[in-house]
Structures are given as structure tokens and as C-alpha cells.
Amino acid sequence: MNAQLNIMEGAFAGMFDHAGMFPPAELNLREAVQAYREYQQGGHAFALQCMVVRAKDLDVLESALHENVRDLQLSVVAAGDDLDAVWKHLDREMPIKMFEMKATEPSQVARLKKMLPAGMEAYVELPMDLQDMQLADTVTEVGLHAKLRMGGVVAETFPSIAIVASMLRDLFKRGLAFKATAGLHHAVRGRYPFTYREDSARGMMHGFMNLLSAATLVWFGGEKDEVVEKLEEEGLLAWRVTEHSIRWRDWD
């Protein structure tokens, strides 16, 4: 059991951010902070990285929590117009570790890179159905990372398996690291409620184990049909944790 835990810690270290104020949880700020701190002390703390907040939440967070904010690690979701306000909070030593921004033009990416403090990670959300790869090329050239939106609160926001497989291969060709957001609330692909509300619609959602396995396969040169097969998997028992690896069917 200890060996299996070590494998899990190695595979999932810092892999998950806490986005408690976003769907499906939709907590208020205080509830989200409390939940994040509880997770920091929990049995899976090794897998936790940042608490995700919007740029507009920073003023409230700072004034409401005062010095108690220093033990957080924040990832700030912002638009280009928010950059100056975010840097103001950095000057006041807010614990901002990561920055996330949606971009539609290469010039927005270049501006973000120019303004970004040294050593801070930044992820640029790319359209999943990229026809023109200039945006991804610019993210690569300036040394930032990609962000993939894997779903939302309605079925139409979930990219198809074919689109996800193509995007993973496009990112790999560029050596572009990525994070994924939205819709990855379950380990394995399946039909789930989109939110925690009683009247929530249901639909097919991607699984984070599917995405992790597919991305790993792309890294090691897997063919597109093999990548698609992993993204399609709906059986939780298809994955097994051994002393030396996490296995998917016949793959380590």
C-alpha cells in the first residue's frame, strides 16, 4: 500500500488546482478559502497546487482575510485589462503563483509575457478547435504554457474526443506544456451532472485519468487511434495502481 501511495504521489504531485468558486461547486469566497485550507491538511494534499480566483476577487480577498491570505497559493484568472490591477496586488505581496488568461490574438500573448514578473508561470487559454496555429506558436515562442477548456455547464462546451486528441498532438509537436480546466471533475469519462444543483443537466464529461493517460501516450509517440481509445475509456477498473506504475489495460 505504501508503494502504491508513493506512485500516486509521484504521478499526481501538484496536479490539481482548487476552483471552488467556479462550477460545479460555486462556493463563496470564504467557503472556498476554508475548503482549500482543509484540503491543504488532508490526505491528498500532495496533489493540491493553487486556489483559483478571478482578478476581481483579489481586493475582497485581501481586505477580508488581511494577513491570513499569506498561506495561500493563488492562480489568478484574468483578462488583458486586469493585468495592471493584478500587478498592484503582487507589489503588496499577495501570494500569486500562477496567472491564467484567455487570448484570441498573438499580440495579447506578447503583452502578457512583457508584463509578467520573472519566474511566474502563465497559462494562455487556446481555442480547442484551432484552425490557425499562430496563437499556439506565439505561446511557444515567448515561453508560456497552454490552457485547454475541457467543458462547462452545458453539453455544447465539451470538445469532442477527436478535437482533444488533435490538440494534444499539436501541443506535443510544439513542446508546449498545458493545464486543463472545466469539465474534469471525475476520474473517468462518463455521463454525469454538470453542476451540483438538483436540477442540473447531465451529459458526457471527460475524465482526468483519460486526459492524463492520453497525454502520456502522445508524449511517448502513440498513434492517434490509440490516443482516441484512451480518451474514450469509461471503465474505472481499466486503470490499476501497482508498486511500480499506473497501468491502463496493457499499458504502463
Residue ranges and their predicted role:
Residues 56, 77-81, 102-106, 127-129, ...:
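Active-site beta-loop-alpha junctions enriched in small/polar residues
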Residues 106-170:
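Domain-core and long-helix interface of multi-subunit machines
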Residues 39-41, 134, 166, 199:
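Short, flexible coil/linker segments at or flanking structured domains
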Residues 1-111, 116-122, 132, 219-252:
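Alpha/beta catalytic barrel-like cores
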